[in-house]
Each structure stands twice: as structure tokens, then as C-alpha cells.
């Protein structure tokens, strides 16, 4: 008796979930031909940027968006959840 549907479910991992590549974290933004890179959400931050699909987000805006949903409010694609920090030189090469 009762709900017999609960017993028939299996605990298999969701194989349809696509793993995302790790997003790149930049402490100092690159300077480019068209000016400096900024966070596309708040437009103030130009340090500690995370690469989203085709734009940059600061850590603060990234965390606010992750609290609300898994999608980016700007490009409507999944937000990066894995971040890699590249090794940046602290001094010029000799």
C-alpha cells in the first residue's frame, strides 16, 4: 500500500549532465586594443575576474549569480563552477 513509485527509482548518477571546463581566474586584467576588461555585470571591477562564456565577471557578481541560479544573468548560459588560477610571473624573466 501507499506510494509504490518511490521504491522503483534507482540511485544512478545523472549521465546527461555535461561537465564544464574550468573557468580562468585573473587577478589583473589584460590590457587590450579596445581598453581594459571589466566585469560585465557591475562594470566597476577590473581585478579578480572570472571568464564566463564570452565576457568577464568579478568574484562578487559571480557569487551573487550562483546564489540565485545556475545560469548567468547576462548570457543565459551555465555559470562556471570550477575555477583555475594560472601561474603568473611575479618578476620579468632574466
UniProtKB/Swiss-Prot annotation:
Q: How is it modified after translation?
A: Myristoylation is required for the role of RING finger protein Z in assembly and budding.
Quote the biased-composition stretches of kind Polar residues, using this chain's numbering.
1-19
Q: Where is this region: Disordered?
A: 1-20
Membrane topology reported for the UniProt record: Lipid-anchor
**UniProt-annotated location(s):** Virion; Host cytoplasm, Host perinuclear region; Host cell membrane
Among Gene3D superfamilies, the record links this protein to: 3.30.160.310
Q: Which InterPro entries match?
A: RING_finger_Z_arenaviridae (IPR024183), Z_RING-type_Znf_sf (IPR038485), Z_RING_Znf (IPR003224)
Quote one Gene Ontology molecular function term. Answer: zinc ion binding
- What keywords are annotated for this sequence in UniProt? Host cell membrane, Host cytoplasm, Host membrane, Host-virus interaction, Lipoprotein, Membrane, Metal-binding, Myristate, Viral budding, Viral budding via the host ESCRT complexes, Viral release from host cell, Virion, Zinc, Zinc-finger
- GO CC terms: host cell perinuclear region of cytoplasm; host cell plasma membrane; membrane; virion component
**Residue spans, zinc finger RING-type:** 39-75
Give the main location.
Answer: virion
Quick one: a GO biological-process term for this protein? viral budding via host ESCRT complex
**Annotated lipid attachment (N-myristoyl glycine):** 2
Motif PTAP/PSAP motif boundaries: 89-92
Task performed by this protein: Plays a crucial role in virion assembly and budding. Expressed late in the virus life cycle, it acts as an inhibitor of viral transcription and RNA synthesis by interacting with the viral polymerase L. Presumably recruits the NP encapsidated genome to cellular membranes at budding sites via direct interaction with NP. Plays critical roles in the final steps of viral release by interacting with host TSG101, a member of the vacuolar protein-sorting pathway and using other cellular host proteins involved in vesicle formation pathway.
Q: What is known of its domains?
A: Late-budding domains (L domains) are short sequence motifs essential for viral particle budding. They recruit proteins of the host ESCRT machinery (Endosomal Sorting Complex Required for Transport) or ESCRT-associated proteins.
What does the similarity note say?
Belongs to the arenaviridae Z protein family.
Whom does it interact with, and what assembly results?
A: Interacts with protein NP; this interaction probably directs the encapsidated genome to budding sites. Interacts (via RING domain) with polymerase L; this interaction inhibits viral transcription and replication, Z partially blocks the product exit tunnel for the releasing nascent RNA product. Interacts with the glycoprotein complex; this interaction plays a role in virion budding. Interacts with host eIF4E; this interaction results in eIF4E reduced affinity for its substrate, the 5'-m7 G cap structure.
The record's misc note reads:
Inhibition of host myristoylation by the compound DDD85646 leads to proteasomal degradation of protein Z (and not lysosomal), strong inhibition of Z-mediated assembly and budding, and reduced levels of viral replication and transcription.
Q: What is this protein called in UniProt?
A: RING finger protein Z
Amino acid at each position: 500500500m501507499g506510494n509504490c513509485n518511490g521504491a522503483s527509482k534507482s540511485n544512478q548518477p545523472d549521465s546527461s549532465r555535461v561537465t564544464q571546463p574550468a573557468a580562468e581566474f585573473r587577478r589583473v586584467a589584460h590590457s587590450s586594443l579596445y581598453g581594459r576588461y571589466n566585469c560585465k555585470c557591475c562594470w566597476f571591477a577590473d581585478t579578480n575576474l572570472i571568464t564566463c562564456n564570452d565576457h568577464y565577471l568579478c568574484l562578487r557578481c559571480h557569487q551573487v549569480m550562483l546564489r540565485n541560479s545556475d545560469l548567468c544573468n547576462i548570457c543565459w548560459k551555465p555559470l562556471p563552477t570550477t575555477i583555475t588560477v594560472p601561474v603568473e610571473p611575479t618578476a620579468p624573466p632574466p
